[in-house]
Amino acid sequence: MDVKLSEIITVSSLVKKYDNKFLALNALNLNINQGEIIALLGPNGAGKTTLISTICGLTSITSGKIEVNGFDVIKDYRKTREIIGLVPQELALEPFEKVINSVRFSRRLFGKKDDNKYLDQLLIKLQLFDKKDNIIKSLSGGMKRRVMIAKALSHNPSILFLDEPTAVVDVELRKEM
């Protein structure tokens, strides 16, 4: 029996041209089905981060259309962001905040109520539970990357984008992730 998976991301004729006229994405079409795991591979400047940023609604598009779970990323921005978790390339953390407070804050940004059990389990899986009351500034680079992953998963999204997720993460944890 042939099982058809539902499309969760649809990118149609996507064009992204930056102000300096650099063409980052040219008439890109892409369909991603629910449950699929994909990797974007290519050299620096190939448009991988630009594609992720446009799907997440963080970068404007020049033309084309992007839908996430049937919602337009421009018209239904909040709806699509609730569905997506994003771990960006750059570490963007509050250096003087405790790990748990930073993760909890990210969850609240999506209108989710506190769920200490869920957040504790998340921190356990990412080997951060014993660091949850530590100030982020005191963590290693790999631990900071894992805090970013915890923040991205804090609101329990259906879709997770990892832009360079294993940068500065030690080899053993990379295997587990």
What do these predicted regions represent?
Residues 43-47:
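Walker A (P-loop) phosphate-binding loop of ABC-type ATPase nucleotide-binding domains
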Residues 64-72, 79-80:
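Conserved ABC transporter NBD signature motif
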Residues 104, 108-131:
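Conserved ABC ATPase "signature" region
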Residues 135-139:
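Conserved ABC ATPase signature
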Residues 160-163:
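Catalytic Walker B motif of ABC-type/P-loop ATPase nucleotide-binding domains
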